[in-house]
Amino acid sequence: KELGINMLLTPIFTPPLDTAVGGERTTVQLIDIVQDADGSYKFDWSRLKRWCDLCLRNGIKYLEIPHLFTQWGAKAAPTVDGKNIKKFGWHTPALDSSYQSFLKQFLPELQSKLIEFGYDRDHVFFHISDEPGMDCLESYKAARESVKESLKGWQVVDALSEYSFYEKGIVQHPIVSSNHISVFLKNKVPQPWVYYCCGQSVTVPNRFFAMPSWRNRIDVSSWN
């Protein structure tokens, strides 16, 4: 709260970010998931409730939900561990019927619980896939379309460097890397969000130890 941060990434399942193909992060999901013999799922939301209570007490107004598909093009499902097995992961294509069936049950229940726990659709952000490139345009479109109805009325944003995704209406609310923001500003994209991470090291500010202090002035360079 003191730093002005009011949104927090909420690991409902392990975030599929910055992992090599076939690799994965340590499982950190908040929600326990059990699949019954008939293929339906049961969810334990108790840790999510505890998380939301903690966030509300500490001034977190918005929750960010991990990407529903893997980074750089939405070609696979993220890691979703159940009680005893890894159910979905790199071995699961994004449009696999079993994963799609899971999402169709999971997302409505998740949304209902988020509202119950104090975070309505105006205070939750969903993601499809992080930083899709042109070589992944079709897979991203297909993944986005597969959850379109489930996310209807909810906010969906994605990190983006390729302007054509916005131009074609595929990503309607881009969060643009600072070293690619120029084309978005030039084309007067309304209220663009900007981000920086480890990739923004040349010609744009960042906060690496080796940089002179004048290159740390991120707020100044982001002001439009």
Per-range role (PLM):
Residues 172-224:
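Catalytic-core region of carbohydrate-active enzymes that cleave or remodel glycosidic bonds
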Residues 150-151, 223:
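Extended alpha-helical regions
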Residues 1-150, 159-168:
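Aromatic-lined carbohydrate-binding surfaces of glycoside hydrolases
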Residues 153-160, 171-179:
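Short, hydrophobic beta-strand segments that form beta-sheet elements in well-ordered domains
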Residues 154-166, 194-199:
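A generic structural motif
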